[in-house]
UniProtKB/Swiss-Prot annotation:
Its main location: cytoplasm. Residues 317-340, 491-518, 1124-1164 are annotated as: Disordered. Residues 1147-1307 are annotated as: C-terminal effector domain (CT), has tRNA nuclease activity. It comes from Burkholderia pseudomallei. Changing E1195A: Protein not toxic in E.coli, CT domain has no tRNase activity, still interacts with cognate CdiI. This is tRNA nuclease CdiA. Its EC number is 3.1.-.-. It is found in: Target cell, Target cell cytoplasm.
Length: 1307
């Protein structure tokens, strides 16, 4: 027994007693003292350590009675009572903690570490028996452990608080170092709060009574058996204690080398709070409050019945965890660095990133009974927010107003990034360098597209990369082989100075509604009684669920079952710009260049996602409202539904919505100027996307099972995209309402993403580029990108219905809709539509695909053009070889192939169409764009000739071939658009520019093809002449000697037989002659395919159609070999006048021996051309005739023959000259030649023959003029009919002898 008038101080005392009767007149102190020591180590580290001294213990083996006139102070002290405890504290009873820890500072060579680590030791009360504790003031326990073995009562006139003790530990550190070329500095700060809650335990019923408030904060009341009863005159607060964690860091790193340096700076600031909720657990729990009961982020649970009764409000809500984070990162490089690909830079680059994020997360409360009932009564409002009420049996909530709704989680994220780069860059230039650079960039782009799941763009980038590798390789090989000239590839080194900047900002804000739930194994009943105020007595359940066997919602006024809404808002923007100027030096000399580009974009999206309320009863759901009942964004599901609505019944579905929009645009251009030429280019892109979605995800309605529905509504029943349904027999369904209105909800989904762009460019002289419109020397164009269009539209209807059953309209005079038209099928009512895709990502992928398609389009068109050029060259070479060996059928076939592979040819166009289909399909993503690409490419290739005409016409008008070429490209683009849309326009432009416009050999090859065709026609006609006897009229019959191809006997004037093509002599028939006025007979003509003609005179001749047939390869001998006939024609006599000798080809002499012109003779010189034309000479001479601006293959062939027989070398006379050719070497050096009668085609020859007699006088006048101006005037008479030849010879005989001496007749 201890009785004092003053204080009893048991600080760090150890008191033991069998029983205790302590009466302190003032304070009772049961503290454990602390002690602090200070230490300094050898290395200078300091330590201040606080520890507990001897523990303060008051140990009573039996019963204890403690009475104080003042406070009972207990800090880390221990009260242990083996029996019963009877305490009467006159003041406050404070059960606190003592804080211990160590503050340590360590100084190192590279920095300082400052740590302060703390912990708390709480007080304890352990009672083996029953407890009867009365406190005249407040009872406050922080971080304490209280164990009331057999329960009892704890009562205070003031507040009773079971709370958490808090300690904070901090770490502060900094370090730095410098190693010459490397340095760093870093600082770190961390502060962590630790909470130690109070724990109250007991073995039997414990009563906690307060004259004011009861607070259980971050603490636990846990009874093994018995009930936990909390009764307060004020509030009862069961809540969470919040601990805070802070982390801050700063770092800088730098590295410097001989040629480069790097600096990195980063920071991180993070703060988070964590709510530690409370727990009250016992067999049964009863909480009573004279004011409010607040359960926040905590759990109140009993094995049996749990009851909460408050005179005012009961709030069962959430606690919240929060976080805020901010990071920065800056990186700066200076000096030598990679410039991308095979280039390097010297300069500065900077990267700055900032990220911010924050969040609020709700922690639900749970109040309930495991196998008993849960009863919650509030005099005013029962509010369940983001929390759960649960009972194994019944849940009953009664209040003036009841709100069961959701708590809102929020997240915010924001990112910013800025980059800049400036300095000098050294890289490859020239066409080969450009191809290499683009191959690298396209390869990287293909990888990025694949990462972005853009397979089409990845494939197109890969095609472009492969093409760039191939073009670069071909160009490099050509350079190694010593290629020269305007079309030769180039390579060089470029040094440029420039800068670039980019920025990006994005943010996303989300709200997520965490609904409440009420779950009962038996009945769930919510009753809103109202408090006598009008419009009071409401039940509102928002975005939450009620589940029970039977659910009853009874409201004095309204029952509101409504949805909640999640939101998601995103915003983004970006911009970039750059410019550079440079100087290059390479195989094309010295050049300068400049470029600039700019881009910007933005995107926004707002989404709303609805969360329906659900009332689920396995048996019966009952709704009774004195006013309206609103089932909006909610569902009532039960086996049987009973509703008695004193106002209106409104049932409506709500739609999820998404509205999004994005924009992106870019533009750029540049120019290059070198010693060999220059070029300029410009490109632009623009994209817009938008999406709009509104759709009912979950239809609202009242759904009954086999029990049916019995709904009575005093006012109007309105269904908006909603239903009252049942699976029961119609006899169990009844709707009685004043009036009934219904309507449907239209759902829709629309999105559209469109991207368009173009590139334009031109070059003069020799281009130094490998990619883009300015890469084609001396040309240019405008190439549209393959238009990107992704869109979708869907619509559907959410219908209203009432299942079959009785519908009773109690106010028929007010009914406006015909109930007979009501939809009675309450199944499959919700027509859904798909949500819109991410339009901003779609826009980004479209831009990528457009760029990839443009790059690949050039590769494919240009590659096919190169392939076709090669095929054309191969066919020309094969045609020449066939001519050399006399195989005219094969020659014609190869000429046809060369034409087919030429610009405008079918083979080239077919292959371009295939390439167009590939690029159009991949670029546009559909069969239609593939068809469009094929149509545009094929049409552009087929109409290459028309484009050339446009180019020449515009070029002539403007005086600029470049303008003409651009006009041709624009025309091709328009034509492609007409036949193939966007893909057609893009591919048509590509084909015109990179195929037809990039074909430097086409003019020469076309001349060669035309010349070969002319040679073929001439040779075939000569073969026809030999077979048909056309020679007879020009050479005396006595001089004709024909070499039979198979070596058979000769036919001569002494042997009046004649020869057919099978090598056999035919018997002479009466009336048939061989002479100047007749041709060979029927067998010969039949062999020509001319039918069974009798002997005919020269006036009939062989028609132009016959010659055309010969020229097309129809002329064959009996064995099918045209070459034999041709060889026979070649072996005709040649010479001067009428005394020709046998061809050298038949006598073993060198073919092509020279003869001398008449040189003053009074008669024309006659040449019988028998040898094939020398193709090398023909190619040299077949150039544009400046007088007419065209190729003249007829003149070229005749000139080659003239060289062969007269010797020397001819060349085209310069523009303005009145003659065709001039000898530049040989015996006639310096003399001029002016040809006549040298048709280029069989059709021209036929026309000459048709009108020769009528135009003879004009012809002879022209002949006289030519003979007066030129030294030689060759006349190719081989294409004239016999009658016209006779007229020509007679007319020449009438000319002055001086002029006749200049004439050379070619036969």
């Amino acid at each position: 027994s201890l009785d004092t008038t003053g204080n009893v101080d048991l600080t760090s005392a150890n008191v033991k007693a069998g029983s205790l009767d302590l009466n302190a007149g003032n304070k009772l102190i049961l503290d454990t003292a602390t002690q602090t020591t200070h230490q300094v180590s050898r290395d200078g580290a300091t330590s201040d350590k606080t520890t507990l001294g001897p523990a303060a213990n008051l140990n009573v083996a039996g019963d204890a009675s403690i009475k104080t006139g003042g406070d009972f102070q207990q800090n880390a002290g221990n009260l242990n009572v083996g029996g019963n405890l009877n305490a009467n504290i006159g003041g406050n009873w404070n059960l606190g903690v003592q804080q211990t820890g160590e503050h340590k500072v360590v100084q190192r060579a590279n920095g300082v570490s400052d740590t302060d680590l703390n912990s708390a030791t709480g007080s304890t009360v352990n009672v083996g028996g029953k407890s009867a504790i009365g406190v005249g003031g407040d009872l406050t326990a922080q971080g304490a452990r209280l164990d009331f073995g057999q329960g009892g009562t704890v009562a205070a006139k003031g507040n009773v608080t079971f709370g958490a003790a808090s300690t904070t530990s901090t770490i502060n550190a900094n370090s730095s170092g410098d190693q010459g070329n490397r340095s760093y500095a870093e600082t770190r700060h961390g502060a962590d709060q630790a909470l130690t809650g109070t724990t109250v335990k007991g073995g039997d019923t414990l009563n906690v009574v307060s004259g004011k408030d009861i607070n259980v904060i971050g603490s636990t009341i846990d009874l093994k058996k018995g009930d936990a009863n909390l009764l307060a005159a004020g509030d009862v607060n069961v809540g969470a204690a919040t601990e805070t964690h802070v982390y801050n860091s700063r770092e800088t790193h730098s590295r410097s080398g001989v040629v480069s340096g790097t600096k990195i700076a980063s920071s991180q600031d993070a703060t988070s709070t964590v709510a530690n909720g409370s727990l009250i657990s016992a067999d049964g729990v009863s909480i009573g409050s004279g004011k409010d009961i607040n359960v926040q982020g905590s759990t109140v649970v009993g094995t049996h019945d749990v009851a909460l009764n408050a005179a005012h409000d009961v709030n069962i809500t959430t606690s919240q965890d929060t976080s805020q984070s901010s990071t920065t990162y800056q990186e700066q490089h200076s000096g030598l660095m990679s410039g991308g690909g095979l280039s390097f830079s010297v300069g500065n680059s900077k990267l700055a990133q900032q990220n911010q994020s924050s969040s609020v997360t709700n922690n639900a409360s749970t109040v309930g009974s495991v196998d008993g009932n849960l009863t919650v009564n509030a005099g005013n409002t029962l509010h369940v927010k983001g929390s759960d009420l649960v009972a194994g049996k019944d849940v009953t909530g009664t209040a003036a107003n009841i709100v069961v709704d959701s708590a809102t989680d929020t997240t915010h994220q924001a990112q910013q990034q800025q980059t800049s780069k400036s300095g000098l860059t050294v890289g490859l230039s020239g066409s080969v360098g450009d191809a290499i650079n683009n191959a690298i960039s396209e390869t990287q782009a293909a990888r990025e597209s694949a990462k972005d799941s853009n397979g089409r763009a990845s494939a197109l980038h890969s095609i472009a990369a492969a093409g760039d590798v191939a073009f670069g390789g071909l160009g490099a090989k050509a350079l190694l082989d010593g290629a020269k000239g305007p079309q030769a590839p180039s390579i060089g080194v470029q040094v440029s100075v420039g800068s670039s900047h980019s920025s990006m900002q994005s943010s996303e804000d989300q709200t997520i509604q965490r609904g409440s739930s009420i779950n009962a194994g038996g009945n769930a009943k919510l009753i809103a009684t109202g408090n006598g105020t009008p419009k009071d007595g409401n039940i509102t359940i928002a975005g939450s669920n009620v589940n029970a066997a039977n659910v009853a919602l009874v409201a004095n006024n309204q029952v509101n079952l409504v949805n909640t809404t999640d939101t998601d808002k995103t915003q983004s923007s970006n911009s970039s710009s750059g410019s550079s100027v440079g100087v290059s030096i390479g195989t094309n000399g010295i050049g300068v260049s400049a470029s600039m580009q700019r881009a910007h974009g933005d995107g926004n999206s707002d989404a709303a996602i609805q969360n329906n309320t659900h009332i689920n009863a396995s048996q019966t759901a009952t709704i009774v409202s004195g006013g309206d009942t609103n089932v909006i964004g909610a569902n009532v599901n039960a086996n049987k539904v009973v509703a008695d609505v004193g106002g209106n019944l409104n049932v409506a579905s709500v739609q999820d919505t998404t509205v999004s929009a994005a924009h992106q645009s870019s533009a750029g251009g540049g120019f290059t100027i070198s010693q060999t030429g220059g070029g300029a280019s410009f490109s632009a892109q623009n994209g817009h996307a938008d999406g709009n979605y509104a759709g009912v995800k979950e239809q609202a309605g009242i759904q009954a099972g086999s029990g049916g529905f019995d709904v009575t509504v005093k006012g109007n029943t309105d269904l908006k995209g909603a239903y009252i349904g049942s699976t029961a027999d119609a006899s169990k369904n009844s709707l009685t309402t004043g009036t009934l209105t219904t309507s449907d909800i239209e759902n829709h989904s629309h999105y559209s993403a469109n991207s368009a762009g173009f590139s334009a460019g031109a070059s003069v002289g020799v281009s130094t580029k490998a990619v883009g419109p300015s890469s084609v020397s001396g040309s240019g164009g405008v190439t549209p990108m393959v238009f990107q269009n992704d869109s979708g539209d869907q619509s559907a209807t959410t219908k209203s219905a009432v299942s079959v059953g009785a519908i009773n309209i109690t106010k028929p005079g007010e009914q406006t809709q015909d109930v007979a038209n009501l939809n009675r099928d309450a199944t499959n009512l919700n027509g859904t539509v798909s949500k819109t895709p991410d339009v901003q990502k779609m826009l980004s992928q479209q831009a990528d695909t457009m760029n990839a398609a443009q790059a690949a389009g050039q590769t494919v068109s240009q590659g096919i053009g190169l392939y076709a050029d090669g095929k054309r060259k191969d066919a020309i070479d094969a045609a020449k070889a066939a001519y050399e060996r006399g195989d005219l059928v094969a020659m014609q076939s190869y000429i046809d192939q060369a034409k087919s592979w030429d610009e405008g040819g079918a083979s080239r166009a077919g292959l371009q169409a295939t390439g167009g289909a590939l690029i159009g399909g991949l670029g546009g993503g559909s069969v239609l764009t593939a068809i469009g690409g094929a149509a545009g490419a094929g049409t552009s290739s087929l109409l290459a000739g028309q484009a050339e005409k446009i180019s020449k016409s515009v070029g002539d008008m403007t005086g600029s071939s470049l303008v003409g070429n651009i006009a041709a490209n624009v025309a091709a683009t328009v034509g492609g658009a007409l036949v193939g849309g966007s893909a057609g326009a893009a591919m048509a432009s590509n084909v015109e520019l990179y195929n037809a416009g990039n074909d430097p050999q086409k003019t020469d090859d076309r001349a060669t093809i035309a010349g070969l065709q002319g040679l073929l026609s001439r040779t075939a006609a000569m073969a026809s002449d030999a077979k048909a006897g056309v020679w007879n009229g020009m050479v005396n019959v006595a001089g004709v000697i024909v070499n039979i191809p198979n070596g058979g006997p000769f036919a001569s004037p002494g042997d009046p037989g004649y020869v057919s093509l099978d090598g056999l002599k035919k018997p002479y028939k009466s009336g048939t002659s061989i002479g100047p006025d007749t041709e060979f007979l029927t067998p010969i003509l039949a062999t020509l395919g001319l039918g069974g003609k009798a002997a005919v005179g020269t006036d009939a001749g062989i028609t132009s159609a016959d010659v055309a047939t010969v020229g097309n390869g129809a002329l064959k001998n009996a064995s099918g070999d045209l070459s034999a006939a041709a060889n026979s024609a070649r072996n005709q006599p040649y010479g001067q006048g009428a005394s020709a000798s046998q061809s050298p080809g038949t006598q073993g002499a060198s073919s092509g021996s020279n003869i001398s012109a008449s040189n003053g003779s009074s008669s024309p010189t006659t040449i019988v051309a028998s040898n094939p034309v020398d193709l090398n000479a023909f190619d040299r001479l077949n150039v544009v005739d400046p007088a007419v601006g065209k190729f003249r293959p007829g003149e070229a062939g005749a000139a080659a023959e003239l060289e062969n027989y007269l010797g020397g070398t001819l060349q085209r006379a310069p523009q303005g000259s009145s003659v065709d050719f001039v000898f530049s070497s040989g015996p006639n050096n310096g003399k001029t030649v002016d040809f006549m009668l040298t048709p280029d085609t069989v059709a021209q020859a036929a026309k000459i023959n048709q009108f020769f007699d009528k135009n003879l006088n004009n012809f002879m006048n022209t002949l006289s003029d030519h003979a007066a101006a030129a030294d030689f005037v060759p006349l190719d008479s081989r294409f004239l009919s016999e009658a016209n030849k006779t007229l020509l010879v007679k007319a020449i005989g009438n000319l002055p002898q001086k002029l006749q001496a200049k004439i050379i007749l070619i036969k």
